[in-house]
Structure formats: C-alpha cells, structure tokens
Design a protein with these regions (language model features):
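Glycine-rich phosphate-binding P-loop
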Residues: 1-11
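"Short basic amphipathic alpha-helical interaction patches in structured regions
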Residues: 8-9, 83-86, 110
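Conserved nucleotide-binding/hydrolysis micro-motifs of P-loop NTPases
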Residues: 24-25, 75-76, 100-105, 162-164
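Conserved phosphate-donor/acceptor-positioning beta-strand/loop module used by diverse small-molecule
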Residues: 89-111
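Conserved GTP-binding G-domain of TRAFAC-class P-loop NTPases and closely related GTPase folds
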Residues: 108-184
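Conserved nucleotide-sensing/catalytic segment adjacent to the nucleotide-binding pocket
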Residues: 14-90, 127
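Conserved beta-strand scaffold positions in the cores of enzyme catalytic domains, especially
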Residues: 18, 96, 155-157
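Short amphipathic alpha-helical segments and helix-helix/interface helices
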Residues: 6, 58, 84, 140-147
Length: 184
C-alpha cells in the first residue's frame, strides 16, 4: 500500500525522492547488533540518530529544490504542519495523502514484512503494538488537525490498492472518509 502510493505520487510529480525514516534506520551504526539482541524492539532502540538524519535530509532536499515525498505515520500533526510551512516558504506546493487500511490488514503487513526480512536474511523491522495502535488511531485526528489548522486545504485519503480515494476538505469529513475506505 505505502510503496505503491509513494510510487504513484512520485510519477505524478514527474519523479523525485522519497524519504522514509525506516530506510535511514538501516544505516544506524549498531543496527546489526540491535537486530540480533532485540529484533522486536529494533525500531525503538535504533531511534537515536534517525530523527536528526531525517531532518537533515529534508532540509538538504528542500534547499536543492528536489520534488519529495516524505513518508510519515501521521502521528504528530504539529511536526507535519511546521515542515509543510518550511516547504511553502521555500516556494513548494504541499499536499497530504493518507493511506487508510483495515486494521487487521495493517497488522498482518507488519508480520509479513518481518517474516520476509528474516527469511531473506535482511534486518527485520517490527512495529510494536503500542506504536501501531497509536499511529492507526491517530491518523483521523491528524488529518482533522491539518485541515482545521489551515495547514492544507485538502487531504486525499487513499485505499491500500489505490482503487479508492476521497478528497477531504473539512475536518468533519476526515473520520468518515477514513472509516469508509478502511471498511470497504
């Protein structure tokens, strides 16, 4: 779902770069040791430099005027709003796309991603129950806040397969649109 959505957005922009903090996490100097010692907490234990790396990369890309997709969990609207303002001040046009996936499909995706990495000899990434629940539940609030703060005039809610999308331009529409796509 996420990869397909990001690729579709990049194509519609005429190409660009995607920033995914989970990919940057794999560059952590202790990632191999962390993954061996506690693979189910790898995301938490490797957080240290990842936020700073992500911020530095975003700043560099903005300064170099690249088209960019910033993958995010939609967990913290205030950070997203501030970053959008930074891009707009630099002359960018910003938009927000939220992926709405049924909860069980989302959880199964975590398990499948982890198993595929282990079977492929790669570094597995697990998302904790708390992290998943917070991000999954928080997306509705974040979309509502982005709209009510005036960060963006609209947010596109997209289904996992990209076959459905709903353009939301009012905070009151956000929860219903996300629920509709998740349940359809």
């Amino acid at each position: 779902g996420k990869s397909r959505t990001i690729n579709n957005v990049l194509k519609s922009m005429g190409d660009g770069l995607a920033i995914d903090s989970d990919e940057l996490r794999l560059l952590h100097p202790d990632i191999a040791r962390i993954s061996q010692l506690d693979p189910l907490r790898m995301d938490v234990l490797s957080n240290g430099p990842v936020g700073e790396w992500t911020k530095a990369l975003i700043t560099h890309i903005r300064e170099q005027r690249f088209n960019v997709v910033i993958e995010n969990t939609f967990a913290r609207s205030e950070i997203m709003a501030a970053e959008a303002k930074n891009f707009e001040r630099a002359g960018y046009q910003c938009s927000f796309i939220a992926l709405a996936v049924p909860e069980l499909v989302s959880r199964l995706g975590i398990v499948n991603r982890y198993r595929a990495a282990v079977q492929g000899g790669n570094i597995p990434r697990w998302t904790s129950e708390v992290s998943h629940t917070n991000a999954y539940a928080g997306i509705k609030t974040t979309v509502q806040e982005l709209l009510s703060l005036g960060t963006t005039p609209e947010v596109t809610i997209v289904s996992r397969f990209g076959d459905q999308n709903i353009l939301v331009d009012s905070p009151d529409q956000a929860a219903d649109a996300i629920t509709h796509i998740r349940e359809d």
